[in-house]
Amino acid sequence: MAQQNMKVRPVLLKRNSLESVEFVKQPHHRRSKSQQVRFKEDGTTKNPTGLAEVDVQTPEDPAVMGKTQATRHHLPPTYSLSFPRSQKAGGFRNIAIQTSPSLRKHFPVFKRKRLTASKSLVEMPTASQSAIQVNGNLSEQDIVSSDLAYLRLAQHLEDGPRRVKVSHAFLPRVPKVQSNGPVSICLEAGTWRSLEKATAAIQVPDDIYHSPSWEARESALSPDRSAEVSNSIHPLDDTRPGDGRRVTPLDSEKSTSCLNATSVASHTPGTEELKPELLLPKDNSDDKDLGSLSSQSKETCVPSSPRTHSSPSQGSHSQPAHPGRASDCPSSSNNHQNLVSLKTNSASKSAPGCQEQTANNPTESDTLEFPNCPGSNHLPSSLSRSETKLQSNREISDINQIHLARGELCDLQGRLQSVEESLHSNQEKIKVLLNVIQDLEKARALTEGRNFYRTGQDLNNCSTCQNTACIIYSVEYDFRQQEGRFHEVLQSLEEAEPVEEASPPPKSPAEPPAPEKQDLRRKTKKVKKKCFWWI
């Protein structure tokens, strides 16, 4: 299969490429062989330069050719189905055919039972490197036979998405080959030279839209070239059967920013650690070349990205989260949801240039719309999942606050209980002390030959003495007596000041203490029933 792919997958390249001479005989040699799947051999025989040489160099533009020569060793190719008309001036024809590398994604059975078909279709982007070099040498019959061969390949995987019918006035032909892969029908818009240089990397299947290795391949479209493509091809009407995304005529700047956001998305620190499991079987070594190239493409695309208004941080925010999930994609049946969640993560964290692809502005005609995208069906669910996660986190924080409030309440209750216990213990101590004082007062009254306390209560018939409340009266008496002495001192001091001025006779300190005691006894008799009622 991989050898047949060499003729199935011609990609955009000029006919008279200098490096393509050594690859001229290989596609014919591979076409004569039986259909076999050799991934490691194909991956090892093709050097990274073969991968990078997909970037077309037009001799008409030496400046751009020099720039592409400087960068072609860094850029892995981007593959998309574009069938432009033959350039009459140049006299050569550029045709690119691609299958969706994520065909196995919806059906995990392909990994084991139908490995030949899936691997061959997955292998196509890297297997056709030498066919890329001799694109100009392929005749029309070879192209038609390659289309028919790809039809046979596509019929093995007829479970995949099939919506590939584009009717446009400018379209030369849209073969039914593209039942699985992305289709970009690049219309003639005056400058095919820029179209050649940009290897029609505008279209990537939405299923693998943010997979690291596919983005590594898409990064072959440098921002400068993508700017030229988007500026020169306004009537770009492309459908992606892989994801059902329909691109209406793009505004050049916004399409460039969105496209470059996907190509720049692979230029992150995680690019060196691309997961080949996402696109190819685990034993495939072709993506190692792609990984190295994409790690190099990070150097070339990122500096020129300000021209096309695509920030490298758009993909860099979302990319480190990709490899962890991407390794599970081929083996699990719910890998589509993982990729969709990856897409939503990258879209939610990207700048406004690529946020326009998601549900922020789904109705604008100049942004990418994907109403029929299989991933778009899961976008609201994944967004709602993130919202529910945020809500659950908030609920957890609220519960924690409630727990804290409950803990504080328990602390307050404990403190209140301790205060109540201390009050109770102090009350008991007070009672004990009052009983002791009562006994002392009673003993003193008996020693003095009195039948009453100093406050005037009877020792035997005092009703308050039974509740140990009368003792406070004696204490109060002592306090009042001390207070009277204190007031006497204060009055003496206050009168000493006017004495210096008018020297009036001080009469208040000379009052006899006997009436004071009688008044205190009267007050205590009146108040004795109110004191210590709480005991």
From Swiss-Prot:
Question: Which residue stretches belong to region Disordered?
Answer: 24-52, 215-388, 492-529
Residue stretches of biased makeup (Polar residues): 255-269, 292-308, 329-365, 374-388
Which keywords does this chain's UniProt record carry?
A: Coiled coil
Bias-annotated ranges (Low complexity): 309-323
Where does the source fall among the domains of life? Answer: Eukaryota
Q: Which residues fall in a compositionally biased region of kind Pro residues?
A: 503-513
Under InterPro entries, the record lists: INSYN2 (IPR029337)
Q: Which family does this protein fall into? A: Belongs to the INSYN2 family.
List the biased-composition ranges (Basic and acidic residues).
Answer: 235-254
Would the keyword Coiled coil be found if you checked this record's keyword annotation?
yes
Entry keyword annotation includes Metal-binding: no
Name-wise, this protein is Protein INSYN2B
List where this protein forms a coiled coil.
411-448
